[in-house]
Regions:
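Active-site neighborhood of HAD-like aspartate-dependent phosphohydrolases
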Residues: 1-46
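Short hydrophobic segments within beta-strands
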Residues: 12-13, 111, 165, 183
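A metal-dependent, Asp-based hydrolase signature
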Residues: 37, 47-83, 100
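Short, acidic loop-to-helix structural element flanking the phosphoryl-transfer center
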Residues: 82-110, 147
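Substrate-recognition "cap/lid" segment bordering the active-site pocket of phosphatases
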Residues: 109-163, 173-177
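Structural recognition of alpha->loop->beta junctions
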Residues: 125-141, 196-215
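Short amphipathic alpha-helix with an adjacent loop that forms part of the alpha/beta core around
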Residues: 149-156, 211-224
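Acidic, Mg2+-coordinating phosphoryl-transfer loop and its flanking beta/alpha structural elements
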Residues: 163-204
Length: 227
């Protein structure tokens, strides 16, 4: 049950507000080509690409440690993080929705997983002119840190309804807070979690525009309070 109060919105970034999937693939390829051109036509290219991909996803295995050491030495990883923001694209309506929510007096927080590169998420946000769109930017390292930071937010705003928008519904399975509306943004890269559809405080949307309709519904439910 969502209770009355000023609404706080928590938005994931990659996959929710911006489409970074193609950007990752393009930046990886160009970074390797620019820093280690000798491997482009060799059998090593696939290993270099996979090692770099696993590294930035935080899933590097021992098998690729040697390759990563070379990628660091050649400046490939640095080049990737320099290139990546150029290719990130906003999802339709993303900025308009964020700006409209803030214009309505809502608190809008970026709440997303940190990149493997420390501070990488904030760097990306600043280079894509997203950082200042939010009232606050919070990043977390894994599930335990996510839950800790969510709890800290709840302690700051104990009586206010939260709306958490994310393309990764698996994160929602850890959240038992009944004053948080969990909104899954549909993504071709993420699977549904069947159990969530049984919860009253869960919704799935196709377009970010639907957030504005949800906000209007919450305002009406709260007695027309628009602040």
């Amino acid at each position: 049950m969502i209770h009355n109060g000023m609404v706080t919105y928590l938005f994931d970034f990659d996959g929710t507000l911006v489409d970074s999937t193609e950007a990752v693939e393009k930046a990886l390829r160009i970074a390797i080509e620019k820093t280690i051109p000798a491997v482009i036509e060799s059998d090593l290219y696939d290993d270099y690409y996979k090692a770099l991909f696993l590294f930035i996803k935080g899933k590097l295995t021992y098998q690729y440690l040697g390759v990563i050491h070379e990628l660091v030495a050649q400046g490939t990883i640095h080049e990737y993080y320099k290139l990546m923001p150029r290719y990130i694209k906003d999802f339709p309506h993303a900025r308009r929705v964020i700006r409209e929510l803030r214009a309505r007096g809502r608190r809008v927080i970026s709440f997303s997983g940190e990149h493997t590169y420390p501070g990488g998420k904030v760097i990306f946000m600043k280079k894509t002119d997203w950082y200042d769109e939010f009232d606050e930017v919070i990043t977390f390292r894994g599930t335990k840190d996510m839950l800790k930071k969510f709890q800290t937010l709840r302690e700051f705003y104990p009586d206010e309804p939260f709306v958490w928008v994310d393309d990764s519904p698996s994160r929602f399975t850890y959240i038992l807070d009944e004053n948080t509306l969990l909104v899954q943004k549909a993504s071709p890269y993420k699977s549904d979690v069947a159990l969530l559809f049984e919860r009253q405080n869960f919704l799935k949307i196709k377009s970010l525009r639907e957030i504005l309709e949800i906000d209007e519904g919450l305002s009406a439910f709260a007695g027309g309070d628009k602040t």
